[in-house]
Amino acid sequence: MAKEGEERKKEKKEKKERKERKRREAEELAVREKKISKKHKSKSKEEEKPEKSKKKSKKYEEVEEEEKSPSPSPSPKKSKESKKKHKRSSDESEEIVDSKPVTVPIVTIESDSDFEFDKEDIKNLLESYSKEELINLIYKTAEKGSKLISAVFESADRDSSQRNIFVRGLGWDTTHENLKAAFEVYGEITECSVVMDKDTGRAKGFGFVLFKTRKGARAALKNPEKRMYNRTVSCLPARPFNSGKPREQQQPVESVKIDLSHTGNQSEMALPGIDLGHGLDKGHQQQQNMSMYAGQNMPFYGHSQPPPGFNPMYGAMMGNPMVAGLQNYRMFGSGMMNQGPMMPPNHMGMVGQYVGDGNVNGVGAGAGAGAGFDGERAWYLR
């Protein structure tokens, strides 16, 4: 049985080998036939070419023989037809000659955009527009990929303020390396700094990150608040110190010349005939004038009363006992206010208003003329 099985296997193998041989032979025959057919086709083409050339040469020979042989006199009809043909051919040749392209000047309407402007002219033209108008013009006319937009992006990338970020909320143990590692995810960083305390050597809680491109800074600012080493950190675009809108200029303040005779506004007081050309505002000037009354030992140039609205106690509080007693100024002559030592302000102001007995240092209950006035005058004349 085993021998029969082996024989069957051998027979099957032989059959397979025969089939493969036949298939290979058939393929080889097909390849040979293709090659032979290609050769025949190439030969037939080569044979056709000389035949065509022979036909052409025969035609040329016939034409030459006709030209050499004397032609019989043509009939008048044929001569007319030949003349017409010659005329047509000459007309066609003339038309062909005239069909050459002729440059004709095209009339165009010139506009301002066709001229080439100077840089100064463009600058003057742009200065007439406001900032908002220029922004709207660029925003509407510029398209993605245009030269204008690319120039804007290039200038923004060159500007460090467009790529710099301010980070706050950092821990005291934050270092430059930690901050750089946290923000490298958004783009390449050119500079990174953490502000340190000189005394302790620890971080103050804020720092700066400068990206190489504006794209990285914008990616970092998409989410202003971030988690960094178990802390909430906030990011803001860093701006230079002098950037932004200019500070509003203060309105120019006129130099005010105030006279004591001016009673329209009792809150505005100054010494007569003195022009304060310091450019101070009215509130500051009022405070300065009141301090001049309270802190300077100046006579009032013959005026019997201080300016209206003046409280004599204000002079005592500001440290000038002389001004505190101005209610009794009419009883002295001019030039006597600056003579002799001064009494402390706590007593002088009270004596000027509330004089009731002869003791200068005491405080009385009544007002009017009496021994108190004489005591006060004696104190001034000491």
Curated annotation (Swiss-Prot):
Question: Which parts of the sequence are annotated with region: Disordered?
Answer: 1-99
Single GO MF annotation: RNA binding
In the UniProt record, does the keyword RNA-binding occur? yes
Location of this chain's protein in the cell: Nucleus
Question: PROSITE patterns, alphabetically?
Answer: RRM
Compositional bias, Basic and acidic residues, is annotated for 23-34
For this protein, the parts annotated as crossing the membrane are none
Where do Basic residues bias regions lie?
10-22
- Keywords of this protein's UniProt record, alphabetized? Nucleus, RNA-binding
Output the Gene Ontology cellular-component terms: nucleus
Please state every residue range assigned to the domain named RRM.
Answer: 163-248
Instruction: Identify the SUPFAM superfamilies for this entry.
Output: RNA-binding domain, RBD (SSF54928)
Question: What's its job?
Answer: Acts as a component of a complex regulating the turnover of mRNAs in the nucleus. Binds with high affinity to RNA molecules that contain U-rich sequences in 3'-UTRs. May function in complex with UBP1 and contribute to the stabilization of mRNAs in the nucleus.
- Record-given protein name: UBP1-associated proteins 1B
Q: Which organism is it from?
A: Arabidopsis thaliana
